[in-house]
Structure formats: structure tokens, C-alpha cells
């Protein structure tokens, strides 16, 4: 992983509260970098600024101050908007709001058609994208008959068909059941590893965040923590003071350590917990 896919410099975003006629700062001088090919999670509770940050990454929102660069392109330059949105695709929380056609393959073709891609290549892109997310056999189905997890995979296929360099996912599993969440997370990781596409996942699920290469934690519009998952989640008290939880096994290790058990809090999954417990005398 070399150069940056996403870079913000001292980013500020303010919006006006129409009722109170006051300005609210949603992002307060945040600088961050996301390397090409990286899988980054941005964590934070409601109102932390994480979704506002995500919307800057494909120029749905533009900075009130500071800069946001997507693959080296300044999002504040109006001439860059089309190219920024082509390079950074976005998947939202509600799958039903993202599907536009009555047949799955037509929905996936919608983006490339709007880019003016040749029909023969569109056919190839649609098939390749549906295979990549494990939904090729549903290509002739009606999207509204699919499960929530399947719909989100179709939404991801629609972004893949546009050949982006980066996909920003704003709480894509928030409305899904556990099996749907697992389907979507598996797809996200495969897209990242197989195609080298940069992934930025906005979430408040700790087990999802634990699977990332790196985590940024936001609180009250500011970046308050940054590091690899083990580094972040081992700071249990700090995470809790921000109003977040840690993965269940990390919480268990923390409670055991408090009771005097010689165990690390840098435990992220059940296998690691089993190994750590087996080594205790």
C-alpha cells in the first residue's frame, strides 16, 4: 500500500440549523489518510461525524473549510466532481433506496449505462460484478423479492460495475439481520482482497471493525483515536468513555484481567480467547 486514495487536510464541515438559525460544526479540523488498497473502518456513535465524513469522500458534501482529496483530486473543484464520483462509489444504509430497476441485472447495468460504456462491455461488467458478490444466479430476479443482505450485495455489484478505485460504505449492515450482515462483510472483504479496491466502512458494530486493517474513531466531529484493531480495542476504558463498546471477547478478557487473571486484552476473536485460556495454568 503506497500512495493515498483519500486524504483530508484540516477538514471542517458546518451546517445551519434552520429552526434555531445557528451553525453546527459536524466535522472539526480533521486530517486523515487512507492508503490505496486499504480496508479502513471509521467508528463512532450517532452524531460523531462519521457519516458526514463519508459523504465528503465522494463529494456528496463539500468542505466548509480545509480540503478533501480523492485519488489526488480536490473535491472542492467543481470540474472534478464527475471523476471523483466515478473513482469513489458509495453504498448506503437502506438497500431499498439504492435499487432502481425491476430486474437485478438491469439495476447493476444502470451505472455503466450512465457512464456511456459500450453495451458489450456493460454485459461483461454486469456478469463479472454479480459473480464477484455471489449473486450471478439471481440476475433475472426482481430485487424487491430478495433479502436485505442480498439487496446490499446487488448495490455493491452496481458500484463494482462502474470500476471504482474505492468504495465507501455508510453503515451498510445497520438494517440487516446477523446472516445478512455476515454476507455483506464477506463480500466487502473479498472485494478488497481480490480486486485491491480501497474500502472505507462506516459502522458502529465492533465485530465488523475488528476485521479492518486500521480503525479511526470519531467523537463530536473530531478524530480521537487511530490504529490497528488490536491497538484500539485493547484500550477498553477509553473506548467506553467515548460511548462505544469493544468486541465481546475483548470485553471478557478485560473483565478477567480486572479479576487478576493473567490474560491480554488484545484478543479479538473466539479462537484467540480459547488459545489464551488454554495457556493459563
UniProtKB/Swiss-Prot annotation:
<dbReference type="InterPro" id="IPR027417">
    <property type="entry name" value="P-loop_NTPase"/>
</dbReference>
<keyword id="KW-0472">Membrane</keyword>
<dbReference type="InterPro" id="IPR015856">
    <property type="entry name" value="ABC_transpr_CbiO/EcfA_su"/>
</dbReference>
<dbReference type="InterPro" id="IPR030947">
    <property type="entry name" value="EcfA_1"/>
</dbReference>
<comment type="function">
    <text>ATP-binding (A) component of a common energy-coupling factor (ECF) ABC-transporter complex. Unlike classic ABC transporters this ECF transporter provides the energy necessary to transport a number of different substrates.</text>
</comment>
<keyword id="KW-1003">Cell membrane</keyword>
<feature type="binding site">
    <location>
        <begin position="44"/>
        <end position="51"/>
    </location>
    <ligand>
        <name>ATP</name>
    </ligand>
</feature>
<keyword id="KW-1278">Translocase</keyword>
<keyword id="KW-0547">Nucleotide-binding</keyword>
<dbReference type="GO" id="GO:0005524">
    <property type="term" value="F:ATP binding"/>
</dbReference>
<dbReference type="InterPro" id="IPR003439">
    <property type="entry name" value="ABC_transporter-like_ATP-bd"/>
</dbReference>
<dbReference type="Pfam" id="PF00005">
    <property type="entry name" value="ABC_tran"/>
</dbReference>
<feature type="domain" description="ABC transporter">
    <location>
        <begin position="6"/>
        <end position="245"/>
    </location>
</feature>
<dbReference type="InterPro" id="IPR050095">
    <property type="entry name" value="ECF_ABC_transporter_ATP-bd"/>
</dbReference>
<dbReference type="GO" id="GO:0016887">
    <property type="term" value="F:ATP hydrolysis activity"/>
</dbReference>
<comment type="similarity">
    <text>Belongs to the ABC transporter superfamily. Energy-coupling factor EcfA family.</text>
</comment>
<dbReference type="InterPro" id="IPR017871">
    <property type="entry name" value="ABC_transporter-like_CS"/>
</dbReference>
<dbReference type="GO" id="GO:0043190">
    <property type="term" value="C:ATP-binding cassette (ABC) transporter complex"/>
</dbReference>
<keyword id="KW-0067">ATP-binding</keyword>
<comment type="subunit">
    <text>Forms a stable energy-coupling factor (ECF) transporter complex composed of 2 membrane-embedded substrate-binding proteins (S component), 2 ATP-binding proteins (A component) and 2 transmembrane proteins (T component).</text>
</comment>
<dbReference type="InterPro" id="IPR003593">
    <property type="entry name" value="AAA+_ATPase"/>
</dbReference>
<keyword id="KW-0813">Transport</keyword>
<dbReference type="GO" id="GO:0042626">
    <property type="term" value="F:ATPase-coupled transmembrane transporter activity"/>
</dbReference>
<protein>
    <recommendedName>
        <fullName>Energy-coupling factor transporter ATP-binding protein EcfA1</fullName>
        <ecNumber>7.-.-.-</ecNumber>
    </recommendedName>
</protein>
